[in-house]
Amino acid sequence: MPLRPGRCYRHFGTPPYTRLEYIKSNPPVLIPKFDLGNPKGNFNTVLKLVVMRPGQIRANALEAARQHANKYLTAKVGEANFFLRVAVFPHHILRENKMMAMAGADRLQDGMRLSFGTPVGRAARVEAGQIVMLVKVDAKNIDHAKEALRRAASKIPLPSRIIVEQAQ
């Protein structure tokens, strides 16, 4: 079955489902690296991608945002001239009660009986004002970092904004 759209998992109304000892098949974390670029660089500007509403961000969306921002920054600024961090981790396990949509499906499936669902993916639960991504650059590369975070924000299902600060 194909993956459901991200809007199906954007909001949450249930407690987090994170206890892996109770889950028979836990889905893998699809984000291979959370820190990219030059972590030891001495940069004077920090740009943060902050969400404005509470919600869930699927690991697929976080990975797409990370790849897009990293590719743009590597091409425009260079690998040694930025540091990018994904600041949230997808702890929450997403479940889906799979349903058939065909003729005679009512004879083959149980409907809402035992409808807890099976694990299909992971998501990060975020609150309003929480940092999702962080980019450190020099002052001359602020415009490129803003564009990279703007492109990353288009992959995230929640409204967000970019905050620019001077590094301490």
Curated annotation (Swiss-Prot):
PROSITE patterns: RIBOSOMAL_L10E (PS01257)
Entries under Pfam families matching the protein: Ribosomal_L16
HAMAP family listed in its UniProt record: Ribosomal_uL16_arch
InterPro entries: Ribosomal_uL16, Ribosomal_uL16_arc, Ribosomal_uL16_CS_euk_arc, Ribosomal_uL16_dom, Ribosomal_uL16_euk_arch, Ribosomal_uL16_sf
Listed name of the protein: Large ribosomal subunit protein uL16
Gene3D superfamilies per UniProt: Ribosomal protein L10e/L16
A GO molecular function held by the record: structural constituent of ribosome
Family according to the record: Belongs to the universal ribosomal protein uL16 family.
GO cellular component term, pick one: ribosome
Superkingdom as given in the UniProt entry: Archaea
Lineage, top ranks: Archaea, Thermoproteota, Thermoprotei, Thermofilales, Thermofilaceae
Sorted UniProt keywords: Ribonucleoprotein, Ribosomal protein
Gene that this sequence comes from: rpl10e
GO BP annotations, alphabetical order: translation
